[in-house]
Amino acid sequence: MYAYFRGRLVSCLPEEAVLEVSGIAYRFLVSAGTARQLPEVGTETILYTHLSVREDALQLYGFATEEEKQLFRLLLLTSGVGPKLALAVLSGMAVPEVHEAILANAPERLFGITGVGRKTAARIILELRDKILKLAPVGSAVASVAADRGGFREDAVNALMTLGFPRPVANQAVGCALEPEPDASLEVVIKRALATMHNR
């Protein structure tokens, strides 16, 4: 509904900012990273915006960059991740760091974030890896993390191990999942591997 708000920064705290636009003060929840990037109080600035609509409330979320807003919205697509947890991820890590953790299949990098456990980290990686890769410009540092297909099988095995499956079982299931379509995406391979194990 809203792309961004431009106005005078009235106040800025670690978790929220107030922006005055045409005489109306809007309260935004922000990540720690956005709070650090905002200018001095009284200065005109822009906050890229996401509006969360619930039955009992409307809440604005503000972001210093379009990239952070985009990642926030992607995180909301992950099963079990709501606005509060998505904002916690962005407060705990910079956008490029989250991208790299997802593409490198490194859930341990997400564990230190408040509210992100082993299974949540695994779901974030499983459900967002292909989406993040599509957004990365060809030749960028982010894209290069996932460019090596040699580590693709190991990424899938590690993701299943993160979900609690033993390595031999995960390795065999990934092998079966790759047989019909060796170039399938990581998300597809893991879903097929999970289906294989559940059907046994």
Swiss-Prot record:
Keywords of the record: Cytoplasm, DNA damage, DNA recombination, DNA repair, DNA-binding
Function as written in the Swiss-Prot or TrEMBL entry: The RuvA-RuvB-RuvC complex processes Holliday junction (HJ) DNA during genetic recombination and DNA repair, while the RuvA-RuvB complex plays an important role in the rescue of blocked DNA replication forks via replication fork reversal (RFR). RuvA specifically binds to HJ cruciform DNA, conferring on it an open structure. The RuvB hexamer acts as an ATP-dependent pump, pulling dsDNA into and through the RuvAB complex. HJ branch migration allows RuvC to scan DNA until it finds its consensus sequence, where it cleaves and resolves the cruciform DNA.
GO BP terms: DNA recombination; DNA repair
Region (Flexible linker): 144-154
Species for this entry: Chlorobium phaeovibrioides (strain DSM 265 / 1930) (Prosthecochloris vibrioformis (strain DSM 265))
Comment on protein domains: Has three domains with a flexible linker between the domains II and III and assumes an 'L' shape. Domain III is highly mobile and contacts RuvB.
InterPro entries, sorted: DNA_helicase_Holl-junc_RuvA_I, NA-bd_OB-fold, RuvA, RuvA_2-like, RuvA_C, RuvA_C_sf
Region described as Domain II: 65-143
Protein name: Holliday junction branch migration complex subunit RuvA
Location relative to the cell: Cytoplasm
Main location: cytoplasm
